Amino acid sequence: LSDHPRLIEASKKMMDRRGFGMSSVRFICGTQDVHKELEAAISDYFKTDDTILYAACFDANGGVFEPLFTDQDAIISDSLNHASIIDGVRLCKAKRYRYANADMADLERCLKEAQAQRFRIICTDGVFSMDGNVAPIDKICDLAEKYDALVMVDESHSAGVVGATGHGVSELCKTYGRVDIYTGTLGKAFGGALGGFTTGRKEIIDMLRQRSRPYLFSNSLAPCIIGASLEV
């Protein structure tokens, strides 16, 4: 889509209207109505409460764990998750568990071992970037509910691709309302330039707006990128 004439034209028009860049982080003078419009559109797409934009999905995954979890908590991560999730987990003091790729028996083992922790979150790619297999999100959600865990899905390689209407693994596996956090990119199916996002429950997004360092200390997305992504 990055070469599609409609996206190129939408990007040009937005640059003419809003300038080349924002020259600031979001909370100073880096927020325009179009940023909020795109956040609302992403929330509607994933059927979530709210969304926060990042400069890249690497930042979204890098900035999601540390604000939410402490050394009293547990992060349970698929062994083939993207490097950005791996690095994000490393930045957090939570106890770490890793289960074999899409192996529900091994995931359940990790969940049992993590029962002493305060909060537990299961993290997985929706579609794994190297092998292309789809995570069994419905089964993951079943285990999360059984063992009182949160669920986070990175939809970077699945949104716009899988599902009856391209709405990602939650559409494919019918798990809307069961996933607590989604992350994703604007650099693939949603325009092909750059940019990332985290979308999910309102209280989680509110916390990230206050404490997620890649959001707080990175310049806001340029209007031309917003314009093209809105056109998608």
Language-model-detected regions and their locations in the chain:
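Active-site PLP attachment segment
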Residues: 165, 171-207
